[in-house]
Amino acid sequence: MAQNLPTIALLATGGTIAGSGASASLGSYKSGELGIKELLKAIPSLNRLARIQGEQISNIGSQDMNEEVWFKLAKRAQELLDDSRIQGVVITHGTDTLEESAYFLNLVLRSTKPVVLVGAMRNAASLSADGALNLYNAVSVALNEKSANKGVLVVMDDNIFSAREVIKTHTTHTSTFKALNSGAIGSVYYGKTRYYMQPLRKHTTESEFSLSQLKTPLPKVDIIYTHAGMTPDLFQASLNSHAKGVVIAGVGNGNVSAGFLKAMQEASQMGVVIVRSSRVNSGEITSGEIDDKAFITSDNLNPQKARVLLQLALTKTNNKEKIQEMFEEY
């Protein structure tokens, strides 16, 4: 019977979903303890859904995620997506930086097949662990024909999110992942998948960022978080470390103090590409006189996702107007 089932590739990178703790009633645990075989052994019902082809890409907490793993993961995912025997790809990932990895893959993978990222907020040994059901649901979503051509998806806590829109909003709750600007695009309840919306921004097959043309390291882009009484010292340190671009997590509508603004304008004149984002969790950054063609606005991308897009944009051009167009299209 198994040989007649569709095949889903499962790529494991670590995280809480692969974590283990000493006690079911304690919150402390170590990420990336369980290998992919242990994960699959805990969910025998997956074998009734699909043939699971599992591979271990890394086994780390996602706070340690980096470009090296991104490229290794993306290249292997692309190889599997190009294989006619594979119906979709599911990726297990720590939740801390899951939204960044998902958005990176959304911009560089070329396929209409489903790609689903999934994680957990409670480790496998915890009371009411959420990883097993999340993974079961993620595989179910990847098997659903309506999941095709939607870009990279994130499945957590019975919700289906677009990679561009999803963010982590709470440090411990299982319902941490939200799409505050647009909402989830669908739901999945014990494997039953429903869609209500379609991602409209460019992704995957429409993207101009070809994985085959990208090299590590990507252009250096830093994020500077602003606050009351902010001085440009950290910003200057970023410039001194040869950042090609800087994302400003401004207050409110991407605003900064007068002294900081002057430093930003000077850096822009020297060719550093500066994107204004916000430390606020939702809403878009509106352009105005502050920009005057010197800065780029991030639309409604948060600072960490704006950084991913700016890194990729800088592999194509330094032209601010063209990069602004990218932020309005992706």
UniProtKB/Swiss-Prot annotation:
Keyword terms, alphabetized: Cytoplasm, Hydrolase
Active site per the UniProt annotation: T16
Record's keyword annotation contains Hydrolase: yes
Matches recorded under InterPro entries: AsnASE_II, Asp/glu_Ase-like_sf, Asparaginase/glutaminase-like, Asparaginase/glutaminase_AS1, Asparaginase/glutaminase_AS2, Asparaginase_C, L-asparaginase_C, L-asparaginase_N
Cell division recorded as keyword: no
Matches recorded under SMART domains: Asparaginase
A single GO cellular-component term on record: cytoplasm
Chief location of this protein within or outside the cell: cytoplasm
NCBIfam families the record matches: asnASE_II (TIGR00520)
Entry EC no(s): 3.5.1.1
GO biological process: asparagine metabolic process
Protein family membership: Belongs to the asparaginase 1 family.
Catalysis performed (reactions): L-asparagine + H2O = L-aspartate + NH4(+)
Compartments (UniProt record): Cytoplasm
Domain (Asparaginase/glutaminase): residue spans on this chain: 6-330
Protein name listed in UniProt: Probable L-asparaginase
Taxonomic lineage of the native organism: Bacteria, Pseudomonadati, Campylobacterota, Epsilonproteobacteria, Campylobacterales
